[in-house]
Amino acid sequence: MSATAAAQRRHSATILVLAGAAFFSGAALRICDSLLPRLAQDFSRTPGTAGRVIISFALAYGLMQLLFGPLGDRYGKARMVCIALFGCIAGSLACALAPNFDALVGMRVAWGMAAAGVIPLSLAWIGDAVPYERRQATLAQLLTGTLGGMMAGQLAGGLFADSALGWRGAFLTLTAGYAVIAVLMLLRLRGEPAPPPPGARIAFASQLRAVWREPWARVVLATVMTEGVFLLGPLAYLPAYLHQRYGLSLSAASALIALYAVGGLAYAIAAPRIVRRLGESRMVLWGGVLMGAGYLAWLLAPVAALAGPIALLVGFGTYLYHNTLQTHATQMAPALRGTSVAMFAFCLFVGQAIGVTLAGATFDHLGSIPLLLGPALALPASGWGFARALRRHRTRADGQP
């Protein structure tokens, strides 16, 4: 076997383990959506207040990107993913054992801090290991793990919410999954190259500034923060919305919204053909249209059964849009890819924290119409704006010598 073939085989095995890590991280990102009504009941809180378990995780996840990204560039991305996985074991176990709501929120902060190093540094590792022309398709493999986890987390959250095991059982299940993947990742580290020598390193703040100075990076980062606010924020309250509007059980509401991830998986399977046929500008444009139309359809749907097919279309549109953003995040500053992808994730999850905060207050005090109408208007506008910016960026890049 040639050295190149051996390296490709090693990379394929590592990508498989990273996809497993992304699965459990994706589950952690969405499992509390379906648990919110159960948490509200168990701790005598409103759904909006119970949403602090999502806000705290998202804020910690976003803020820790500013540390994990530079650490990945310094000490090796796969090594930092492995450390993060062991941190997730501790964080999820602590959440399962939390004695009260405030302790649970605090432990979700710790869990979010650890989880911050898993998916973004996995993306950055792929950016280093896979040429750009094959990167969309390879990122789609990681996306399959993430989306499978999101779907499983949404479903499991609803099932646990309706069972005697409750939220503690949900978190203990994730602890066990993290433990398996952490051990597999530890075994993969034997084939990883050594981190760069000290002379090749630059200060953390300089790494962040170097990425921020790139005009295109600022466009990508602003766009993904908008996605966090208007897509992920309201999405957290959709199971509670279906439960309240149609009287569905939490497991049934969660199962319908879990089809969001199935739509994303459909994109991941078809990604190479979609990229060739549509191109990136039309992908983000149509992604924005599908997301916005989906939120409007959720608002207007006369029966609960329509929520599932709508979720599937929204999921497909999301990843037309998001995977294009994600691919550009790996190219914002190739020499500092870990920092670039970490800043991308920081903006996404700070946007999500803002969005969940606004959505929770809206849901508690104003109801479902503004909760769903805001994304229905904002997401198509964001897709149109980024599509225009992307075309201008391509034109400038093609005009350079």
Can you describe what each PLM-predicted range is?
Residues 44, 76, 97-103, 131, ...:
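Helix-breaking motifs and short loop linkers at transmembrane-helix boundaries and internal kinks
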Residues 2-8, 190-220:
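Juxtamembrane intracellular "pre-TM" segments in multi-pass secondary transporters
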Residues 65-76, 267-279, 363-364:
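Helix-to-loop junctions at the C-terminal end of transmembrane segments
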Residues 175-195, 385-390:
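C-terminal membrane-cytosol helix-exit motif in multi-pass small-molecule transporters
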Residues 281-325:
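C-terminal transmembrane helical hairpin of 12-TM major facilitator-type secondary transporters
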